[in-house]
Amino acid sequence: MSVSAMFVALQGALTADQDIREEIRKVVQALEQTAREMLTLPQGVHQGAGFQDIPKKCQKAREHFGTVRTQMESLKTKFPADQYYRFHEHWRFVLQRLVFLASFVVYLETETLVTREAVAEILGIEADRERGFHLDIEDYLSGVLTLASELARLAVNSVTAGDYSRPLRISTFINELDSGFRLLNLKNDSLRKRYDGLKYDVKKIEEVVYDLSIRGLNKEATGGAGGEK
């Protein structure tokens, strides 16, 4: 094969790769738009009487996950199944955002941490990497860390809304989450930096709980006068 023929073949491979990436980008852009639309729903709990509308907001968010599953099915068809990590960077951030949204909705519904397997099911993908397009463990953990920041914000806004029991429950949840992360030996630099931010979320929530204690409102909360879940 001549040198020119070799480079023609290389250009063909480059073009094919670029075409795949362009098709992936189109689907990812649609996923990002869906995620933006979804974000306004659960975050509505921070506003005014949002706590009374939690079930309704969660239900609407879950309806959007139907769109996400359809878009995920489309994304799976855009690249060879055995090349997941070759193109992973294209959807990594939106997948982390969707993990956060799923975990926030589940927390608002049950005040528990959603499992990676449950998130994968919500998104219409696999938990096991051997089965194809899957939820990477580090993407799951990144989404959960975003949840921690959101709950720190929720603890503050709960007090403003007169719901004094919620920050206490959030504090218990976040402390358990922090204990869980301490069991991990994180090698990913980005994820480790994200985890470093968890201690600030813990501190922020502790300050809210301490303020409630100083004002005597924690007794009122544990006495059953706090807001509903």
Swiss-Prot record:
Domain of life of the organism encoding this protein: Eukaryota
GO cellular component terms, semicolon-separated: cytoplasm; nucleus
Annotated localization: Cytoplasm; Nucleus
Ranges where the record places region DNA/RNA binding: 86-90
Coiled coil residues, start to end: none
Signal peptide: none
Record bears the keyword Glycoprotein: no
Gene Ontology MF: a single term: RNA binding
GO biological process terms on file: RNA metabolic process
InterPro entries (UniProt xref): Translin, Translin_C, Translin_fam, Translin_N, Translin_sf
Alphabetized Pfam families for the sequence: Translin (PF01997)
Annotated family: Belongs to the translin family.
Protein name: Translin
Organism annotation: Gallus gallus (Chicken)
Lineage: Eukaryota, Metazoa, Chordata, Craniata, Vertebrata
